[in-house]
Amino acid sequence: MQHNVHAARPAPHIRAAHHHSHSHAHMHLHPGMEQHLGPSLQQQQQPPPPPQQPPHRDLHARLNHHHLHAQQQQQQQTSSNQAGAVAAAGAAYHHGNINSNSGSNISSNSNQMQKIRQQHQHLSSSNGLLGNQPPGPPPQAFNPLAGNPAALAYNQLPPHPPHHMAAHLGSYAAPPPHYYMSQAKPAKYNHYGSNANSNSGSNNSNSNYAPKAILQNTYRNQKVVVPPVVQEVTPVPEPPVTTNNATTNSTSNSTVIASEPVTQEDTSQKPETRQEPASADDHVSTGNIDATGALSNEDTSSSGRGGKDKTPMCLVNELARYNKITHQYRLTEERGPAHCKTFTVTLMLGDEEYSADGFKIKKAQHLAASKAIEETMYKHPPPKIRRSEEGGPMRTHITPTVELNALAMKLGQRTFYLLDPTQIPPTDSIVPPEFAGGHLLTAPGPGMPQPPPPPAYALRQRLGNGFVPIPSQPMHPHFFHGPGQRPFPPKFPSRFALPPPLGAHVHHGPNGPFPSVPTPPSKITLFVGKQKFVGIGRTLQQAKHDAAARALQVLKTQAISASEEALEDSMDEGDKKSPISQVHEIGIKRNMTVHFKVLREEGPAHMKNFITACIVGSIVTEGEGNGKKVSKKRAAEKMLVELQKLPPLTPTKQTPLKRIKVKTPGKSGAAAREGSVVSGTDGPTQTGKPERRKRLNPPKDKLIDMDDADNPITKLIQLQQTRKEKEPIFELIAKNGNETARRREFVMEVSASGSTARGTGNSKKLAKRNAAQALFELLEAVQVTPTNETQSSEECSTSATMSAVTAPAVEATAEGKVPMVATPVGPMPGILILRQNKKPAKKRDQIVIVKSNVESKEEEANKEVAVAAEENSNNSANSGDSSNSSSGDSQATEAASESALNTSTGSNTSGVSSNSSNVGANTDGNNHAESKNNTESSSNSTSNTQSAGVHMKEQLLYLSKLLDFEVNFSDYPKGNHNEFLTIVTLSTHPPQICHGVGKSSEESQNDAASNALKILSKLGLNNAMK
């Protein structure tokens, strides 16, 4: 390090006569030096005089830096015994240092002063430009950047010789060297906003940028309070000087200790001064300054309030973070009533403290932060470069390539650039031959790669016989070297190995002159999807931007049209069906399965491309898109075109729909046949009965359809239980169509009693029902002989219709026309008994059947009377009475009618199931309703019913002895109910359980026995004695 840093001293430095007249040869001592050395000999004994402003000054302080460096080299060549005196004299001469701390006698050493004169003459003669200029206004401070507007624009240090460059670019903490103060007053009196400092022939406008330039390179780690302007500097003895380095060392503490604080403060305060606002207490001028000399170091260019969207508290946070200090808000006081309080908040910003009042704590915090920002002595952070608002006019920084990538991704197209091989630069550009790039500086031969054009930073200025860089620091500074320096290779590979020269004239290089090479334009090909664009530019990047701009013009129109089409499609979708729905509908009409399948996915993860296949029967189409839904839609659109080529549909394809519609007329036909069967019997009420059946059948059919009472699966299971065989087994045979098909077909097979039937349907449930219906019809056709017209009509009817037809069947059974099925209990007809849930319908059926079958029931009642008469003659002592016999006749008639009614209505399912609890529950309500019907249809009084009740119980006991089964009555107390309950159990096969209800236990037993007799008559056991 060969820098010679000297600090400014608060003493006048007047060189007006010397620099303007240049007539100092007649003086023994240099006039400029006499003004300095005279007071310097007396400065150690007396305090310095107050600073005075000279009338005018030349601009000698801002000399060329190259000559100053030459002067320093001459000073280093002096002998060691003269080093101390020369250093002190040089310091006094160059910096106005009254306080030179030299231990030697300066006035007696004429040789040293002669050398100083020679150096000064050399400086004056070499700076002839300065002597001819008229005196300008008094300079404020030396500004090494004033004559270098380029460096000011880039906020960099002035250029130095090459061997000094590393020292200046390394650290920001140390102040820049060679800051020469040309006046006695310190830098804190300067105001850069006044345009009063003309710097060595430079424009005044450049001086305004000096604070920014130095501000970027000089940082203060802590707050500096400037001491008073005039201070008494005590001499410090200088240690022995042994080498030349001790004299010229810029950081030597032994020679500048007494003046070091002022040096640091002047150099650090100089860039931090700003133009204060015009107020009474903040105004600072040359003659008015506070006692401590402290000034706010806020820079107007970095004002914290420049950001519109940042609150004062946010700016304080940035200020504290920038200066590496802590800040804290404290609520120090609350005063005033509860509804209108005033809060005092104190902000501790490092060592500073600010307080503010507000009606809200947050408001007081912001006020304290605003006060701190305005009055703080800490350095403000540099303003951040704010990006333009979204959608603003400054959104031009987006390059065409970036915009093209976004648009192509939106359209689902891939982009890639294809470079011509002749445009590719050489790969081995790290170390050119002989470190000079000889093959790049000479013109390449035919077929060789052409050198790319230079970047913006590679422009150079022509000066003398060599090339010198422009003042701005280049991106790759190691590429630039002076005429006398040897070039060295770069440490890291860069984009351009060596910038090619510009211009058509011959250039001078380190290996001799070489002609300029014309640079051909770069050419690149851009592919966007299946489209091709060619871009041309001076550089490869410009060619890419040109190609991207051409592609954008085409793709933007495509994107607009695509968005319009999508909008129209979305509007039309509300009116018509999508292509996918249309394909499914056509598949259902033509009985063809429709299936969509994603075949493959292509492209990167952020821009997938899907290929989906649409399969309808044997026709396959493919669709492509950036989403599965889009590709599926496009495949469906292609499929619609293919399906339109098929021949038109034939009407035979809709037969399954016709078969479904045929079911309803079948029920009405069965009802019609039922009406003909019922009306076939003669009776007085034949004329009115068909009209009543027509009136009651339609609502009954609707109820059955709603409640699904005629489920063939249930009917088949009940039939198997009645026949004491295994339940039917259902099995799915085939399934036509996949999960995505709108209409599928299932084939179900059911097997029971060695018979098998199949059914088809669009669902498994429907196929199962169809199969059960087919098997049920098959099993009933096997049981019943085809000669029985009544039974054949019953097979085609529903359960409700069948229950209405069973009364004639029982009559035929009484006459012996229906073959009996052999059971352990006795013969029983082969009919299926189903449970009826519609009680009102039962009542109507019972009434109709009773009126139409009066004669047949009377014949059956006579047979029952004979059985009852035999029982009464054997067991009753009072059976001879005519009244008893008449009552027995009436009761027997009632019992016969009840048995016929029960046979017709099918009031109990106990003959099918052995579950006693279900039987009790089912027979409870039915028997209660039937008991009312019996009362209505009978002409006997209640007393006759009660007296005949004994006969009902005894008749059941007598019948049990004849058929060899046991009867067990179980009585339950009244409890909370109004009636008594009796349960009768019959040990028949299967066992039967019935219950009865009455106001007394006797009545309940008779009711239970009556219900048991009804069940036995229903099973045909009452005919066993014949």
UniProtKB/Swiss-Prot annotation:
Changing residue 596 to A: Crucial for the structure of DRBM 3. Signal peptide: none annotated. One of its GO terms (molecular function) is double-stranded RNA binding. Changing residue 606 to A: Abolishes RNA binding without altering the conformation of the domain. Its main location: cytoplasm. Gene3D superfamilies: 3.30.160.20. Component of neuronal ribonucleoprotein complexes (RNPs) that contains at least various translational repressor and mRNA turnover proteins such as me31B, tral, Upf1, AGO2 and sometimes Fmr1. This is Maternal effect protein staufen. It comes from Drosophila melanogaster. The gene is stau.
